[in-house]
């Protein structure tokens, strides 16, 4: 079950979405994973990379069932230029 409204359910839905991005010349790149947290059958990954060339944070939450991904939620946010930050804490 996919909760990203731009992606259809299932592996084929993910493949179709990534192919559509590639046709538009948009790359979704994960460069670094800062933490992976798990509790029960939920796993959260907090990562950084680029989306369409822009610095981006990725938060992916999966629900695992019988050893397979059963559900996925995600949040992507463009990381603002450091000169605009209101603190020195950073995104991660």
Role assignments for model-derived ranges:
Residues 1-92:
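C-terminal and inter-domain tail/linker signature
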């Amino acid at each position: 079950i996919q909760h990203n409204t731009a992606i259809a359910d299932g592996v084929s839905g993910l493949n179709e979405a990534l192919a559509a991005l590639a046709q538009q010349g948009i790359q979704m790149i994960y460069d670094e994973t800062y933490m992976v947290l798990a509790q029960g059958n939920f796993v959260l990954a907090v990562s950084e990379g680029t989306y369409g060339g822009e610095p981006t944070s990725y938060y992916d939450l999966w629900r695992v069932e019988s050893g397979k991904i059963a559900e996925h939620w995600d949040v992507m946010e463009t990381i603002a230029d450091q000169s605009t930050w209101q603190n020195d804490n950073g995104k991660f």
